[in-house]
Amino acid sequence: MNNLLDDIKNNYLFYGFYQRYRAKGRLRSIKRNKKKIPPYLLKDNFEQELNYKLWSTKGARFEASTRNLIQKKLSAQSVGFLSAYLIVINIVHIYNLSFWKLNITANDVAFASTAFSILILLYSQLESAEDHGVKAEKFHSCALEIGELYNKLRLSKSQETDEEKRKRIREISNEYDLVLRKYDNHKSYDREKFILNKYHYHGLNFFERFFGQAKYYFLVKFKYHLLIWAPLILFVGLNILKIYEVIK
């Protein structure tokens, strides 16, 4: 009987400790989530909300324009590198040269040349369809238009009465909706890049910034760098393996 009472007592103490631990965990979670709430939502103020929307959307559209310019540049570079690799392969075939330690047959060279030709053709078509140059220009124009609305809203804070300000806010909000309908939306990682650039305002720590930048790199730049450097890395890697086999 005493053992049963002791077990009940211990279980009760353990359960009480567990409940207190969960309560503290919920409290910490609430505090963390409260810190992540955007400042403009902490107060029920439509003017502040519109101000943040204009500011953040303008920044995201500028980031989208910059991203498309970067992709346009990297796309041209990757096509150039792939074309250079194709020329080198054909030169090796014509002059009967060797690939360092690799013994490449004529059939291997012909296959590699054909594969690179198909890859360049397909990749060029896909990148041409993206039309990064035109998108960059449109996103830039959109950001400028939203920037004008943002400046109007900022000026209305100090130069108008409350009634005039409310009327101006409604007008700016309607104009903002019209601007959004005119242009394509930016990608989610464009807004994330804007938030990363304004990390002090959004309260991001080092790890959030690091993983955010890494995610942006893999989504925007990685595929181009892979096309540029993968053939060269593959060539060097195969030669290193060949040298290792010779030494062994």
PLM segments and residue spans:
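Conserved non-transmembrane functional hotspots
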Residues: N2-V79, S128, H132-Y224
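Alpha-helical transmembrane segments and their immediate juxtamembrane boundary regions
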Residues: L69-V134, F211-K248
